[in-house]
């Protein structure tokens, strides 16, 4: 745990080990798994391609963070990724449409397709992370502990400060 000079909603603080994600296919590139990313800060955007909040909030926010934290991404300290976690509209939100959406939105982050177990309405990673819907963002610290997880809109500035506090300062 770290001392935090920022204010987050009490419900957003999680402090539990991040479960493995269960991905049927990676688009753009495969970032690895929670264990192989030990020592890195991980930001996951759980989204659906037809989700208004994802298109208006979490998608643009991750694009902003991709620029804001470009140095930390380049030196391997920070991984930003998206998981397409479909719990409704299964026949519309296909992998083919997802790939088209990724091209259209010019998303170059790793995008995982959350795996559905046979007969299950909710995909595996969504269940493991106990997400409440989309968009939902989870932030995992360098020790593999979920430090933040929030459904819907939140104030980005305190979360950006939290991410910054988890990164190792680079020497100039």
Question: PLM features: what roles do these ranges have?
Answer:
Residues 32-55, 80:
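Short active-site neighborhood of thiol/selenol oxidoreductases, capturing the structured segment around
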Residues 38-42, 74-79, 106-110, 142:
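Loop/turn elements at helix/coil->beta-strand transitions in domains of secreted/extracellular proteins
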Residues 162-172:
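Short, solvent-exposed cationic patches
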Residues 105-107, 113-162:
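Thiol/disulfide oxidoreductase modules built on the thioredoxin-like
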Residues 55-105, 116-124:
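Structural microenvironment flanking redox-active thiols in thiol-disulfide oxidoreductases
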């Amino acid at each position: 745990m770290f001392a935090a000079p920022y204010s987050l909603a009490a419900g957003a603080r999680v402090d539990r080990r991040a479960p493995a994600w269960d991905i049927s296919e990676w688009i753009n590139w495969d970032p690895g798994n929670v264990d192989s990313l030990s020592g890195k800060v991980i930001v996951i955007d759980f989204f659906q391609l037809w989700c208004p909040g994802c298109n208006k909030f979490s998608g643009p926010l991750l694009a902003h963070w991709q620029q804001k934290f470009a140095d930390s991404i380049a030196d391997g300290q920070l991984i930003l990724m998206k998981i397409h976690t479909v719990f409704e509209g299964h026949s519309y939100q296909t992998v083919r449409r997802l790939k088209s959406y990724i091209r259209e939105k010019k998303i170059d982050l790793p995008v995982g397709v959350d795996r559905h177990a046979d007969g299950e309405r909710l995909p595996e990673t969504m269940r493991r992370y106990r997400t409440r819907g989309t968009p939902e963002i989870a932030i995992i610290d360098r020790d593999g502990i979920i430090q933040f997880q929030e459904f819907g809109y939140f104030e980005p500035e305190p979360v950006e400060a939290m991410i910054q506090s988890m990164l190792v300062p680079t020497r100039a």
